[in-house]
Amino acid sequence: MSGIVEQTAVPSRVATVSLHTSPLDQPGTGDAGGMNVYVVEVARRMAERGVAVDVFTRATRADLPPVVELAPGVNVRHVPAGPYGRLDKNTLAEHLCPFIFGMLRAEAQNEPDHYDLVHGHYWLSGQAGVVAARRWGVPLVQSMHTMARVKNASLADGDEPEPEARLRGEDQLVRQADRLIANTDDEARQLREHYGARDGQISVIPPGVDLEVFSPGSRRDALARIGLPAGTELLLFVGRVQRLKAPDVLIRAAAALLERDPSLRSRLVVGVVGGLSGGGMREPGLLTDLARSLGVADVVRIEPPQTRERLADYYRAAAVTVVPSYSESFGLVAVESQACGTPVLAARVGGLTTAVADGVSGVLVRGHNPDDYAAELHRMIAEPAWRAKLAMAAPEHAATLGWSRTVDELLDVYRACTAPRALPLAACR
């Protein structure tokens, strides 16, 4: 009987590693995005189920306290590593050693066996996680979120390929992780094909959406709350402004749409909600200059990142949310939009093929030709019955992707990897 109890025991404390971006950061700014949301939502719900979570992240300011309580049972631990300030993500590998030292030093202040498991997010965190997990004698669970070989295979024009150090680091990480978490079946396939991961090493667990915050509501009221008149056709982009996310595709598509139907200009708004990020689109005026050159500056509205509650209003106000990314391991924005009852027009890439039910809750487009996006946008505006059909199905599709399911399935993985401690770590594979 004791063996059965050990096999099903829930770990008491998990060390989560989010080196390059803090869960306290506002999503949509810098390197903060869907991964930040994932770490926060999972940590909160793990704590509600009795699993304490410490999130280790790099300190970006000297005045940050060593520990900040994010929620009951969830602490964010700021680790000094390299100079303060926002650093280019590609330079952070140079500061792995002090970061790892800081993690080990923090753990050494506790009783032995303080952590039952390490969960790394992104390859940099995984590098630190490998060392910490082996030092503490606990399993390493790794979520890649994005992968270098996948990104390099679908670069936007002008984007730079991921560095060789990341390629080698990801190869090493896949070999050493006890369990890999893939967001979708497509990501699991990529882990096998590009990195040689074994089937039994991978667990496919889709991320979720907060269905209490992101829920349907009156479009007219939402338009008023964000300062737009009733009848506005809002084409919405949400995310970091970087080439990978391709906000320029939406602006070019809007120009093609207005060329096709000039009568739309008086009620069309292209909303870009998000902050500047890495990936080659750092010039503050790049999108506004593009809009001006295409003659659509009068309909383009660029807004900073919003709180979750405010963002939900943007989704509700939109006629359609456009996600034209070149690569996505999942596509949280697409799911949030659908949860609010707004259909999605997205690129047929990566996790977006799971996040969007093509022809049911949205439409997937092959490639990144603005004319193809313009054609689909025109249909959604010109055929309200078609858009209404998609909008009605969107919340139903999003409801299958709640965070409770994500955390339940992650807990199953954690249990398998932590019990019994006497077994080899490879047993959780």
From Swiss-Prot:
<dbReference type="GO" id="GO:0008375">
    <property type="term" value="F:acetylglucosaminyltransferase activity"/>
</dbReference>
<feature type="binding site">
    <location>
        <position position="342"/>
    </location>
    <ligand>
        <name>Mg(2+)</name>
    </ligand>
</feature>
<feature type="binding site">
    <location>
        <position position="166"/>
    </location>
    <ligand>
        <name>1D-myo-inositol 3-phosphate</name>
    </ligand>
</feature>
<feature type="binding site">
    <location>
        <position position="306"/>
    </location>
    <ligand>
        <name>UDP-N-acetyl-alpha-D-glucosamine</name>
    </ligand>
</feature>
<keyword id="KW-0460">Magnesium</keyword>
<feature type="binding site">
    <location>
        <position position="122"/>
    </location>
    <ligand>
        <name>1D-myo-inositol 3-phosphate</name>
    </ligand>
</feature>
<feature type="binding site">
    <location>
        <position position="34"/>
    </location>
    <ligand>
        <name>UDP-N-acetyl-alpha-D-glucosamine</name>
    </ligand>
</feature>
<keyword id="KW-0479">Metal-binding</keyword>
<dbReference type="InterPro" id="IPR017814">
    <property type="entry name" value="Mycothiol_biosynthesis_MshA"/>
</dbReference>
<keyword id="KW-0328">Glycosyltransferase</keyword>
<keyword id="KW-0808">Transferase</keyword>
<dbReference type="GO" id="GO:0102710">
    <property type="term" value="F:D-inositol-3-phosphate glycosyltransferase activity"/>
</dbReference>
<dbReference type="InterPro" id="IPR028098">
    <property type="entry name" value="Glyco_trans_4-like_N"/>
</dbReference>
<feature type="binding site">
    <location>
        <position position="20"/>
    </location>
    <ligand>
        <name>1D-myo-inositol 3-phosphate</name>
    </ligand>
</feature>
<feature type="binding site">
    <location>
        <position position="315"/>
    </location>
    <ligand>
        <name>Mg(2+)</name>
    </ligand>
</feature>
<feature type="binding site">
    <location>
        <position position="146"/>
    </location>
    <ligand>
        <name>1D-myo-inositol 3-phosphate</name>
    </ligand>
</feature>
<dbReference type="GO" id="GO:0010125">
    <property type="term" value="P:mycothiol biosynthetic process"/>
</dbReference>
<feature type="binding site">
    <location>
        <position position="316"/>
    </location>
    <ligand>
        <name>Mg(2+)</name>
    </ligand>
</feature>
<comment type="function">
    <text>Catalyzes the transfer of a N-acetyl-glucosamine moiety to 1D-myo-inositol 3-phosphate to produce 1D-myo-inositol 2-acetamido-2-deoxy-glucopyranoside 3-phosphate in the mycothiol biosynthesis pathway.</text>
</comment>
<comment type="similarity">
    <text>Belongs to the glycosyltransferase group 1 family. MshA subfamily.</text>
</comment>
<feature type="binding site">
    <location>
        <position position="89"/>
    </location>
    <ligand>
        <name>1D-myo-inositol 3-phosphate</name>
    </ligand>
</feature>
<feature type="binding site">
    <location>
        <position position="240"/>
    </location>
    <ligand>
        <name>UDP-N-acetyl-alpha-D-glucosamine</name>
    </ligand>
</feature>
<feature type="binding site">
    <location>
        <position position="245"/>
    </location>
    <ligand>
        <name>UDP-N-acetyl-alpha-D-glucosamine</name>
    </ligand>
</feature>
<comment type="subunit">
    <text>Homodimer.</text>
</comment>
<dbReference type="GO" id="GO:0000287">
    <property type="term" value="F:magnesium ion binding"/>
</dbReference>
<feature type="binding site">
    <location>
        <begin position="26"/>
        <end position="27"/>
    </location>
    <ligand>
        <name>UDP-N-acetyl-alpha-D-glucosamine</name>
    </ligand>
</feature>
<protein>
    <recommendedName>
        <fullName>D-inositol 3-phosphate glycosyltransferase</fullName>
        <ecNumber>2.4.1.250</ecNumber>
    </recommendedName>
</protein>
<feature type="binding site">
    <location>
        <position position="328"/>
    </location>
    <ligand>
        <name>UDP-N-acetyl-alpha-D-glucosamine</name>
    </ligand>
</feature>
<feature type="binding site">
    <location>
        <begin position="31"/>
        <end position="36"/>
    </location>
    <ligand>
        <name>1D-myo-inositol 3-phosphate</name>
    </ligand>
</feature>
<dbReference type="Pfam" id="PF00534">
    <property type="entry name" value="Glycos_transf_1"/>
</dbReference>
<feature type="binding site">
    <location>
        <position position="318"/>
    </location>
    <ligand>
        <name>Mg(2+)</name>
    </ligand>
</feature>
<dbReference type="InterPro" id="IPR001296">
    <property type="entry name" value="Glyco_trans_1"/>
</dbReference>
<dbReference type="InterPro" id="IPR050194">
    <property type="entry name" value="Glycosyltransferase_grp1"/>
</dbReference>
<feature type="binding site">
    <location>
        <position position="336"/>
    </location>
    <ligand>
        <name>UDP-N-acetyl-alpha-D-glucosamine</name>
    </ligand>
</feature>
<dbReference type="Pfam" id="PF13579">
    <property type="entry name" value="Glyco_trans_4_4"/>
</dbReference>
